[in-house]
Structure formats: C-alpha cells, structure tokens
C-alpha cells in the first residue's frame, strides 16, 4: 500500500517537473523561452522560486538553467582533447538564473533567452523524496526511509527501535565506509564524481560542471550534505561540489541546521563545524 502511494507520488511530480517529458509544465516553460511567460501550478512555481534562492546563496554554482548548456564535455571515454576555450564559453552562454523571470501575481515563469532551458534534476530528486515522505506520513506510515537515486530521507526508527543510519564512503579508498551517521528525521544527499570523470594534463575533471564557467568542477570527489529537507541537501551538494572545499564549508557553516562532509581529490576528509567526525568514524 505504502509502495503504491510512493510510486504514484513520484509519477505525479515527474509529470509536472521533468524536462525530458514533453508535456510537463517545465517543458512548456522551456518551449516558450524567449517567447512568452507560462502560467504554472503553485507547486512548480514555488519549487523554481526556492531553486533560485539556492542559486543566490551559492552565487550561481547551483543553477536550474544549467539544462541550457551545450554538452561539449564527454565522460564516456570518447573525448581525447579538451574543448576549446571559445566552445566552453559558448556552451554556457544561455545559462543564468537571473534570466528566469518569475511573476508572483500571475504565477508565471518566463525564460528571457531563446534556447534557455530549466532542468530540475539537481533539486527535483530531493523534492520527490520530501514529498514521498509527506504522503507516507500523512497516510499513517510512522517510520520509513526513502531513497531517490541517492537522495535519502528517513523518519521514525527501524523495527529494532534504533535510528536509521547512513554510511559515508571515501571513493579514494576503495569505497570503504569511513563514518556511519544516525539519520533522525533528517536527510542526506551525496554527490560524487568518482564514477564519471576525465583526466587532462594530470587534472581530474568531474562530470559536475560549473554553470558559471563551463568548466568541470575540480578538487572534490564527494560531497554529503545533511539537512532536514532532502531538497536543500540535493541542491546544496551540487553547489558545494562546484564551489570547492573552502568556500563550500564556509557557506555551510553559516547555514543553520545544515552540515556537510567533503572528500577532496587527495582523499582527505573535511567536515563542517557541527559534525564531530571522530564520533562517527569507524
């Protein structure tokens, strides 16, 4: 019963916000880029509004208009030379959350530039995890854990009355779990580049691309963000990955109720102020 409810909710949201389903409201917004504003449901409007707030917070390191990017980097081994600087610059010309125009009164979204596109992948999975939890809680599911491709939201306790736990791995050390954290009515999202990357001149370029420059993020192999809402953890993990270790930690340390663990490309582990990593390390 709960599984059916969860699946129905996932489908409902996908049919609202997926940019790869041509009939969704987000696809309609994308089709009308540079042409006209599109009225959307309040749910879609508010999600986009929150996404823009995270763009402001991360100074554009997280940006839902990243879907406008030309896919010039290939991470399947087929790319033998680095793209040119001109191509890289051109690839991000249409990205920019400041060109997403929201009109609260009409509840419309307008993309200023023709060819601009929204993609809610970096926040949508977290949003789905939160909404599934809400649906299950409302229908009497007093404890559970939802995992939407790595975005995890847990509430209540396991059947043995112990809290749910999540293991954090170090990708640079044979994916060994180095710390286990209890998840008590909270969520975690891990973003990693250890599966998809290319190396040029000894620099490891990850598949997570900085929407501001068009260059892949470097310096980090994994980011785990803990927050009450999976949506926030999801978007911030991407943003921190792009911002890098110092700026990323600095940002998280200013945010209430949010913590993170970063593994850099040397395998070193960094954590935000509120996490005493020694307490949870194996």
Where are the regions a protein language model picked out?
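Mature catalytic core of soluble alpha/beta enzymes
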Residues: 1-282
